[in-house]
Amino acid sequence: MPPRARRLPTKGFTVQNRQIRIAAVGDHILAGAGDPRAVGWWGRVLARTSAPGVALENYVLAVPHETTEELGARWWGEASRRFSESGENRLVVALSDADLDLDASSSARSRLNLANVLDTASQRGIPVLVLGPTPSLDESRNQRLAELNAAYLDVADRRGQVYVDAFTPLRDHEQWRADLAAGGGLPGQAGHGLIAWLVLHRGWYQWLGVPEPTA
């Protein structure tokens, strides 16, 4: 009896050479709060991320109004359950301005909390992309947040991790401010689109090691 012919791959078939799992930790804005399309900036980023030979899985682990200390206490226990033992594991940390509401808030303590997250991830061989906090309409709050944003940026830079500064370009951005005013302080469709644009154009593809889309 002649051997059965092997079925050829269908047109467009590609072999998945890279298996990537991304755990994204952050607050309610990471989860798309304020976006009437319920996609959020994170969904927009993922929609613009595809490459031949790459299988990407993502897991959103969001807690509203979370401080860096709270994030640091939970991220590994939650993210590690989503990570793979055989593929690539990556971490996205979306920071908020919640540390400003602490009674004994200080940039030094916030720096240490973020440093602990990045150091733990580095020890486990997990590349990290950090998205900095976004500005509000409260200028006095923004002045304090500017200091915190600079501290976060320094922590990430010292450890060679990618830091996307969302605060500086959005602080005086008319469309961002109009979106916050219309949404009761939350970014809407336009605001989430602006965050996504910053992430996509500030090192996302290089961090993942995939080519940028041509269109």
List each language-model region with its residue ranges.
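Oxyanion-hole/transition-state-stabilizing segment in secreted/luminal serine hydrolases
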Residues: 35-38, 69-111, 136
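A generic structural signal for well-ordered alpha-helical segments
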Residues: 49, 121, 155-156
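Serine-esterase "nucleophile elbow" of acetyl-processing enzymes
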Residues: 2-64, 77-86
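Active-site segments of SGNH/GDSL-like serine hydrolases
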Residues: 94-100, 117-147
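Structural recognition of the beta-strand scaffold that forms the well-ordered cores
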Residues: 22-24, 57-62, 89-94, 127-132, ...
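A general structural detector for well-ordered alpha-helical segments in enzyme core domains, enriched
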Residues: 41, 45, 79, 110-117, ...
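Catalytic His-Asp segment of secreted/periplasmic serine-dependent ester chemistry enzymes
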Residues: 134-215
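Cell-envelope and extracellular/periplasmic
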Residues: 29, 61-66, 92-102, 157
